[in-house]
Amino acid sequence: MQIQVKLDKGYLPDEYAKYASVKEAGNPVVSFPFTLTDLPEGTKYLPWSLVDYDSIPVCGFAWIHWLASDVPAVSEIPADFSRTTNTPQGYNSTVSRFLTDPEEVHTGYIGPTPPDKDHDYHFRVYALSEKLDLEQPYYYNEFLRALKGKVLAESQVDLPARV
């Protein structure tokens, strides 16, 4: 299984990251498009996660940017999928009890906004033969627990975003 995300000069394009023109509460909200190839036979659903581990020195924890589950298996996910789908999506890190702005986005895609230097965002897609059936919205730990014993294949790509 392979993931393809088009980069611009080696970085996630600005329209999906820090310099996006479409934002909510200062955060980019238009999710990036991607293509999947070589899905294993029997794949019916595609959950994924987008996590920034380079945020640990900045805020003390890995920043969750996007969780999606029970997406019917397709080879192409269009731009802005997060805001235009009824697919179950989990909490991103704006739900943190350390963030107090009620206007911030709490579920779905929140684009990269590296504050200190370029960051690599770990985008992992899983191929499943059955749904995760998570109660929406859900947390990353619940997402990971639900994956156990259900993964046919998985693939990861690191998406650099510029400061």
Tell what function each PLM region has.
Residues M1-V163:
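N-terminus-centered regions that define maturation/targeting leaders and the start
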